[in-house]
Structure formats: structure tokens, C-alpha cells
Regions:
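Disordered, acidic interdomain junction associated with two-component signaling
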Residues: 1-28, 65-69, 119
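Hydrophobic residue at a beta-alpha junction
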Residues: 55, 84-87
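Charged docking surfaces used in two-component/phosphorelay signaling
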Residues: 38-46
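Active-site residues of response regulator receiver
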Residues: 80-82
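The C-terminal output helix
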Residues: 2-9, 143-153
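Conserved sequence signature across two-component system core domains
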Residues: 30-33, 54, 77, 108
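Short hydrophobic/Thr-rich beta-strand motif most characteristic of the beta2 strand and flanking loop
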Residues: 48-63, 129, 141
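Alpha4 helix (beta4-alpha4-beta5 surface) of REC/receiver domains from two-component response regulators
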Residues: 87-99, 104-130, 136, 140
Length: 153
């Protein structure tokens, strides 16, 4: 009986990795952790996305402004709450939303409770991606936000 049980394929575990989701579009990655930015960029590029990245709010606003003025704003902004320089992620997101109220900003943070998520959504973020995240969670979130943006455009 044990041999028969062993021959059956295992049911997918609840903690099985989320599959990667391929797509198109531009993603602005704003995070003070250099390694995390590099890994996120590598994963997203492999899945078909173009990426621009920086580690502080001032650069994020400049990059967004520049792309917005050329008519090609990022499809998704991944915004960490802790950034280098003087501005945090919430302040940076507010500045970007003042420039483009249709900006699609996803909060990435390691300290996100249900209440905190609600505050971010009220402030104009379109989603929250808790850290640490898996490659599949990253690509699924980016795909969902990028395609939702294109539908409303």
C-alpha cells in the first residue's frame, strides 16, 4: 500500500512557487536595496519588460517626469517605502501622482499589515507587494497592474 501511495503524484503544496507571468511594458523600480533592484530587474527583463531603476525619490520623480513628457510613462512603478535621499516612498508616490493621476504605483515593503495596505490604497497606490516576494509574485503583480492600465487607456 505504501508503494501505491508513493507512486501517486503529490498534490501541489500551498507554498508552491507562483509561476512567472510574461508581459510587455516599462517598469520603474524604486528601492534603496541595490541587490533587490538588480534581481527584480533581471526577472522582469526575462519576462519581457523594460526596466528603469533608481534608489531615491528625487531620481524616481525625474525619471517618471521625463518618460511622462515623451508620452511613454512607466506602465508600473514598484515603490519601496524606504529610499535613499530625503524622501520616502509615500512622499515620492504623492509627487508622481500629482504629475500623473493615472500613475500605477505598487507599494513594496517588508512591513505591511492589512491596515497599512488600506492606507496605501487610499493614498493612490494600486497595489501592495509585501517583501520578501518570490519571482512569480513579482511578475504576476506587474502583469496584473500593467494590463489593467492598458485597458483603461
Amino acid at each position: 500500500a505504501d508503494e501505491a501511495a508513493a507512486a501517486k503524484p503529490a498534490a501541489p503544496a500551498d507554498n508552491a512557487p507562483v509561476p512567472l507571468k510574461h508581459g510587455k511594458g516599462t517598469v520603474l523600480i524604486v528601492d534603496d536595496e541595490d541587490d533587490l533592484r538588480r534581481v527584480a530587474q533581471m526577472i522582469l527583463k526575462r519576462c519581457g519588460y523594460e526596466c528603469v531603476e533608481c534608489d531615491n525619490g528625487q531620481d524616481a520623480i525625474k525619471i517618471y517626469q521625463s518618460l511622462y513628457r515623451t508620452g511613454t510613462p512607466p506602465d508600473v512603478v514598484l515603490m519601496d517605502l524606504t529610499l535613499r535621499g530625503g524622501m520616502n516612498g509615500t512622499e515620492t508616490a504623492s509627487e508622481i501622482l500629482a504629475l500623473d493621476r493615472d500613475a500605477r504605483i505598487v507599494c513594496t515593503s517588508g512591513s505591511v499589515t492589512q491596515e497599512v495596505q488600506m492606507v496605501f490604497l487610499e493614498r493612490g497606490f494600486v497595489g501592495v507587494l509585501p517583501k520578501p516576494y518570490e519571482a512569480g509574485e513579482l511578475t504576476q503583480t506587474v502583469h496584473r497592474v500593467a494590463t489593467a492600465m492598458r485597458r483603461s487607456a
